[in-house]
Amino acid sequence: MLEGQQLPRVQYTDMDDNMKNEVMDICNAACDTHSNNNEICAKTIKEILDKRFGPSWHVIVGEGFGFEISYEVKKMLYMFSARFSAVAVWKCS
């Protein structure tokens, strides 16, 4: 599926470039640090995003999932990390 594609890679976002780059850095760092535990990785990302951008952020980290969500405009990112995990983050207060 991702063979031959550059990672990290954004699958979808409506964030502006500054926020997108910052959120991608946060997600990649958490995925690198917690590469063996998706739950701790997701919790770490959520805590950082809540502090940096205000609550309430929601995070999914893993492989083989689908999702359909409501979210605040300009507050959604779906990406593949450098560790091949998919990461979806969105804000919905």
Task: List where the protein language model places each region.
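Charged, amphipathic alpha-helical regulatory modules used
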Residues: 1-93
